[in-house]
Amino acid sequence: MPTQPLVSIDAVPLVVHGGQLCVVTGLRLFEPFIGQAALPGVLLNGNERLEEAVKRALLSKTGINSYRFMVHTAVFDDFERDERGPTLSIAHLVILEQVPENDSVRVYPLSQLPTLPFDHNQIISQACAVLLDSLWVNAELTRALLGENFTTADVVARMKELAAAAGRAEPVVNNVGRALSSNKSIRKLDAVPQGTGRPPASWQWV
């Protein structure tokens, strides 16, 4: 009789920290990979919805109890992704407000991501691809990522970070400022002088 695969729910928590887009991980408490940083994940209970499982994974593995936005990204079904047996991973991207205060949390910029257990690097890469493709298409998700106020430089930085993490070519950003100017969902803020240089263009959601 074939082995029924288990269903794992894995979260990809992203947060802007120190001016960089980062992944929040927790330390594994059990084998395999005990003590190593990994994405927060749990096995789906029989009476549990996906969003409930994501929330449980975030709280139990990293202490995260709030977030700005959550969205499903992909399903990973490699039979060898977990040495303990066949599992399906249903991955969710989660945009956080801030880094959680928890000793078991490890935060890595996307540009400095180590090799994580299982297929977690692939899960992160796919989540970044989904987020990059959703910029300005999904206004709620874009707003969660950029915050209420942001600069053109912030948009450019996020685009480059996500493209690199997704394994894509560096995006063309020459016309980002012009595209922002024509977007009816945001408005340009009055420039605030900063020293002798030209102040960065700042934007706010309307």
What are these regions (language model features)?
Residues 5-7, 51-55, 59-100, 134-142, ...:
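Active-site segment of metal-dependent pyrophosphate-handling enzymes
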Residues 23, 27-30, 34, 41, ...:
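Short, His- and charge-rich active-site/binding loops that engage polyanionic ligands
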Residues 39-47, 144:
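Short histidine-centered catalytic/ligand-binding loop motif
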Residues 91-93, 100-137, 145-159, 176-179:
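NUDIX/MutT-family hydrolases
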Residues 168-190:
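Charge-enriched amphipathic alpha-helical scaffolds
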Residues 186-206:
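Long, intrinsically disordered, low-complexity Ser/Thr/Pro-rich regulatory/activation regions
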Residues 158-169:
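Short helix-coil junctions and helix-kink-helix linkers
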Residues 1-37:
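N-terminal strand-loop-strand
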